[in-house]
Amino acid sequence: MSDWTAGYVADIGYTFGYYTELNPLRVKLAFLDAGLVAPDVGTACELGFGQGVSANLHAAASVVSWHGTDFNPSQAGFAQELAAASGSGAHLHDDTFADFCSRPDLPDFDYIGLHGIWSWISDANRAVIVDFIRRKLKVGGVLYISYNTLPGWSTFAPLRHLLTQHAGTMGANGTGIVQRIEGALGFADRLLATQPLYSRANPSVPERLNTLKGQNRNYLAHEYFNADWHPMYFADMARWLAPAKVGYACSANLLDHVDAINLNAEQQALLKDIPDAQLRQSVRDYMVNQQFRKDYWVKGGRQLSALEQAEALRLLRVVLTTPRADVPLKVTAALGEASMSEAVYGPVLDALADHKPRTLAQLEQMTSGKGVTFAQLNQAVLILAGAGHVQLAQDEQVAGKARKSSDRLNAHLINKARGSADVGYLASPVTGGGFTVDRFAQLFLLARSQGAKQPAEWAQFAWNVLAAQGQRIIKEGKPLDAAEDNLAELRAQAQTFADKRLPILKALMVA
């Protein structure tokens, strides 16, 4: 392995994922729910941006100036391609952390984000990042950091260690990481078949291994097979970040803000008896067996008064991004599946059903006559946002300014969808971030952009693209061989797209 990789998997690219938690706009809802002042973000940085999908969607869909690095030049090259296509001005580099963090041309940042990368890097790189946060995060600025944590990883970490040891020692010379992963997974199967005491003491391990076997190999390579891989207790994370002068603010997982769906009454009572915030978080991790944390930290957190908090919450704009009829009145959290009250959620969803952004003050006016209190409205928005049905919306003026760059990026992405399904997201200047749009939907949008008006025309366009490349639709695990079967499936999907998805994409300024 070449020295520049520093033990990090580099012979296979990371997935083309989008992570909404990296959207600085989300900070507002989380911080206001926690009673904290949320910064206005003008400059942002992502360290270890992978393929750069999140960084580019956020840069193109907002007026925030984005900077970032990923030391894999192939990934950085793709990220730079997207930045050039959008004209967002995002500054995306292929520097090492040490080189990037010492660049003299970087501004100070309102927001710095790291998704997952903390768990996969060396202590030396962690020290570089902590020093960077100390120097470059503004007072009042927010750090988003997600990482593998304990105790949730304590059961499977030993097998992960064995997988990487096997890949490093038993993999044939000259074979790629995918072949080494397959060999390691096969060996783990053989091991568990011998019924070792380890798996008998940890009965969830075989099921977890089966889950791994079904996952994308690019994902597994980066998540599990780096030389450095360190799940970390929350208290250890707090010690690492202390020199950066940041303190824990709140969870970036919005559902974590609602104790009633995560903790039983006894657990809630125990946590209330713990005065120390860090110990409280540590104990909570044991209660929910936390495996992956998504946290916001702040440099100089400030509490809002109850009046300031209520006023700021009422100014938030939100938009429904799921068809009203498709929103289930159930949500899954640490305690399992919880039901949502029709009396509360029904009026809130009805008020948002046209997919137009509305402030919480407007929603309060629209639902108060139906017996919904502001506290209930606030929690409903929080849970709906955490479940992925509602997103925060930018001011109309900001959305208007971002429209040109988001349109350019989307045009580039839907054109690329002709040849690949790699990037399943497009930019929304309404939400300031990405929105899931699969390959076929992107091809339908491409057909519309070329003048096709009807769903049947979109389906024919998509089929022409697929057929020219010898591609077929996979339905229920099997390829559709006949052209008429492929076209029939595409027509059905195009009609559903026209009825359900297109109105939302128009409301989000994606279409």
Label each region the model flagged.
Residues 10-42:
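Conserved alpha-helix/loop element of class I SAM-dependent methyltransferases that forms part
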Residues 51-63:
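Conserved SAM-binding loop of SAM-dependent methyltransferases across substrates and taxa
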Residues 102-112:
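A short acidic, Gly/Pro-enriched loop at the edge of an enzyme's catalytic core
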Residues 127-139:
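A short glycine-rich, Lys/Arg-flanked "PGG" loop and its adjoining helix->strand segment in the class I
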Residues 140-148:
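Conserved beta-strand signature within the Rossmann-like core of class I S-adenosyl-L-methionine
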Residues 147-171, 184, 191-197:
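Conserved class I S-adenosyl-L-methionine
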Residues 357-367:
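Short acidic, hydrophobic short linear motifs in intrinsically disordered regions
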Residues 399-450:
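Short, amphipathic alpha-helical interaction segments positioned at domain boundaries
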